[in-house]
Amino acid sequence: MVFYLEILWFYIAVFLAISDEIHSRIMWGLFADFYILLAGVIKESVASNIRLWIVHEFMEAIFHFVLLSIIFLSLEIGILAAIIHMTVDLYHEISGIELTPLGHRCLHFTIESIFFILLFAAGLPT
């Protein structure tokens, strides 16, 4: 059990990366037409591109929350993973940094790993 807790941050970061890939492949592959129509409906509701983008990021965070909560059987891990993933996405877009897809994935993995290492180092219960 001690080994599991010491490397839990790594598992969370890996499954969050896998979750992001699953989200991309499902939404832009399997449901691309629906996703585009949904974006049009949401844009009409929120009336600005920035709000549309924030709604998109929030919906993606919900996807990560559900998936990671199920995988780790922990609502806390699901919530924290979704929040840190959304925060990295928001920061990356606002900062204007141009990254390749691999660079973007590395940015997420690094920040999310550091976040969970610090969280577990602080001794917070999961």
For each of these PLM feature ranges, what is it?
Residues L5-L8, S69-G78, G123-P125:
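Transmembrane helix interruption/hinge and helix-loop junction motifs
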Residues W9-A17, S74-V88:
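Hydrophobic core segments of alpha-helical transmembrane domains in multi-pass membrane proteins
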Residues F63-S69, G78, L90-E93:
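Generic transmembrane alpha-helix signature in multi-pass membrane proteins
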Residues H23, V88, I111:
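Short active-site segment of divalent metal-dependent hydrolases/proteases
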Residues E93-I111:
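Interfacial loop-to-transmembrane junctions
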Residues A17-I50, H92-G96:
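Cytosolic, membrane-interface loops and tails of multi-pass inner-membrane proteins
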Residues W53-S69, L107-F116:
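Core segments of transmembrane alpha-helices
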Residues F116-T126:
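Juxtamembrane boundary at the C-terminal end of a transmembrane helix
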